[in-house]
Amino acid sequence: MTTFRFCRDCNNMLYPREDKENNRLLFECRTCSYVEEAGSPLVYRHELITNIGETAGVVQDIGSDPTLPRSDRECPKCHSRENVFFQSQQRRKDTSMVLFFVCLSCSHIFTSDQKNKRTQFS
């Protein structure tokens, strides 16, 4: 959120300026000689949110990948107990650690937060 600062003496807007000698951020008035130190060295922050899918990279032959861990969690669709799992590919602050399971029988994708029986990893 952007906030504006105003001069205490003449009420004009203050502009950011770098104090190169002391390596700090200042706000100064262009009308009078008023200068104040910034509370934070941050002028602007731009957070990028990527819109990749949580299951990005899931392909038809995911079960043949020997690097993926296996589980015997029951598939809610076909009740098979053969699946592989991986963590969400989203890297955001508000994303919790959710495991995605891919059933090797029917390719159904389900998550660890669904109400299923306890998972035993192999």
Swiss-Prot record:
Residues binding Zn(2+) 1 are 7, 10, 29, 32
Record Pfam families: Zn_ribbon_RPB9, Zn_ribbon_TFIIS
Q: Which GO terms describe its cellular component?
A: nucleolus; nucleus; RNA polymerase II, core complex
Gene Ontology MF terms in the entry: DNA-directed RNA polymerase activity; nucleic acid binding; zinc ion binding
Q: Where Zn(2+) 2 is bound, by residue?
A: 75, 78, 103, 106
Could you tell me the Gene Ontology terms of the biological process aspect for this record?
A: maintenance of transcriptional fidelity during transcription elongation by RNA polymerase II; RNA-templated transcription; transcription by RNA polymerase II; transcription elongation by RNA polymerase II; transcription initiation at RNA polymerase II promoter; transcription-coupled nucleotide-excision repair
Function, as annotated, reads: DNA-dependent RNA polymerase catalyzes the transcription of DNA into RNA using the four ribonucleoside triphosphates as substrates. Component of RNA polymerase II which synthesizes mRNA precursors and many functional non-coding RNAs. Pol II is the central component of the basal RNA polymerase II transcription machinery. It is composed of mobile elements that move relative to each other. RPB9 is part of the upper jaw surrounding the central large cleft and thought to grab the incoming DNA template. Involved in the regulation of transcription elongation.
User: What's the protein here called?
Assistant: DNA-directed RNA polymerase II subunit RPB9
Q: Which gene encodes it?
A: RPB9
